[in-house]
Amino acid sequence: MNIVWANPEKNIEQAQQLIQQAGISDLYVLPEMWATGFAIEPEGVAEDEQSSKALAWMRDFALINGSAICGSLAIRTSDGFFRNRHYFVTPNNVVFYDKHHLFKHGREHMFYTPGDSPVIACWQGMRFLLQTCYDLRFPVFSRYGRAGEYDAIIYVANWPSSRQLAWNTLLRARAIENQCYVIGVNRTGFDPNTHYEGGSAIVSPIGKASDSLTAELSLDALGKMRDKFRVLDDRD
């Protein structure tokens, strides 16, 4: 998704078009700050949570289509703080995770309030650990068992092309070490400062990336693999 800078209306239109192209699915994943681009200085760009057009659209989409949809938004919460909030929206529920590892190299920590702990969202029997961009570099935070028990990790990102190799490598590492599926969704295009190459991927628990950006995640296959090769029993 090539995000239009600071334009939720245009990005909602674009998200709708991409979803139509993807076809029917149980879960759709959008990038980090998909409605605005990566707004380091959120004043005048971030939406108020109570009146967010992007969040309202996510709620409506989930309800109308009977699907789940997730992605992060630059949000001002009712306490007046800005948060990089990863929403997981289903027809009947909204779960959110506030990005814990704020990107100090880009001054994100100067404007946003971090979350305290991992969050797991459940949908159609599958447990998804919600993560955002820079979190990918910190394996202890997402460690299976320590972060909770889950079946898949979702990383939404604005990960620059200059560090693309790290993105590709770490997605596979998180899948292998936690014996789980990993869904990594990164934006494409340009913002005022950075180029983004994309590289979105769906990675199997053995580290193999799908040839398509649409995939079926099998709880049965995951359970059999974990039972046969019990790496998680020996985790730190």
Predicted regions and their residues:
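Hydrophobic residues at beta-strand termini and immediately following loops
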Residues: M1, Y97, A121, V185, ...
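Cys-nucleophile CN-hydrolase/nitrilase-fold catalytic domain and related Cys-dependent amidase chemistry
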Residues: P8, Q16-T90, F96, S161, ...
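Short, acidic/polar
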Residues: K10-I19, R137-R143
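Short polar catalytic/cofactor-binding loops
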Residues: M1-N7
